[in-house]
Amino acid sequence: MTLQEEIIRQLGVKASIAPQEEIRKTVDFLKAYLRKHSFLKTYVLGISGGQDSTLAGKLAQMAIAELREETSDQAYQFIAVRLPYGVQTDEADAQKALAFIMPDQTLTINIKAAVDGQVEALQAAGVEISDFNKGNIKARQRMISQYAIAGQMAGAVIGTDHAAENITGFFTKFGDGGADILPLFRLNKRQGKALLKVLGADAALYEKVPTADLEDQKPGLADEVALGVTYQDIDDYLEGKLISKVAQATIEKWWHKGQHKRHLPITIFDDFWK
């Protein structure tokens, strides 16, 4: 088995999908998790205005709405959370995503004071924080807020990790990489886009340039620039297609580099890192 085949196997990616079937499968998955854990009544998800959180949010709201109808339990709720650092430059996209999702509840927590306070405390202790490192603090602070909400609201936190993100390790360890449930896992970027099209999302929500937008000194830095490879190449690779040797080498480099992010803390029994 080639490395490409092994990665595809681990991430569960299909070469082609039926969007309606994947929508149904995901909604049922989200419903089943809450039904199994009767002490949970809510899903919590940060909404950025990008493709991934828009899709995960819509599917979560659909699942919650069906659960309420099937059980007559009005305690089931989907809580969308806006988590800007100061003023988000593409706030209009976030509002457009919320209008599409129509969440039961929307909360806004501005993380700037918490992030800046942490950076200042570290600097006071003599630890200088790089802009890149500060970006990771932002991602982790967003998850702190979401788990605080989930803890108060009998909730589970939804993550937006998908195959095209997982393969490159393009997420913050214990930040956006930390969640209770990953409804998009197995889908690549173009497949997620296909689901949003079927769901009737505004094209602007899935055609916009993907960005983590975590670094102050590189605002709106495109994922593809940061990674050095296009999502088209990543998606093609995940679908078992041939791509250029340069693109393949870049993708596989990121796969190996991000391996530690796909595991729980390493124990003496682990050998994947050797």
From Swiss-Prot:
It catalyses: deamido-NAD(+) + NH4(+) + ATP = AMP + diphosphate + NAD(+) + H(+). Mg(2+) binds at residues 52, 165. Catalyzes the ATP-dependent amidation of deamido-NAD to form NAD. Uses ammonia as a nitrogen source. It comes from the Bacteria. It comes from Streptococcus pyogenes serotype M3 (strain ATCC BAA-595 / MGAS315). Deamido-NAD(+) binds at residues 140, 173, 180, 260-261. Belongs to the NAD synthetase family. ATP binds at residues 46-53, 160, 189, 211. Pathway: Cofactor biosynthesis; NAD(+) biosynthesis; NAD(+) from deamido-NAD(+) (ammonia route): step 1/1. The lineage of its organism: Bacteria, Bacillati, Bacillota, Bacilli, Lactobacillales. Homodimer. One of its GO terms (biological process) is NAD biosynthetic process. This is NH(3)-dependent NAD(+) synthetase. One of its GO terms (molecular function) is NAD+ synthase activity.
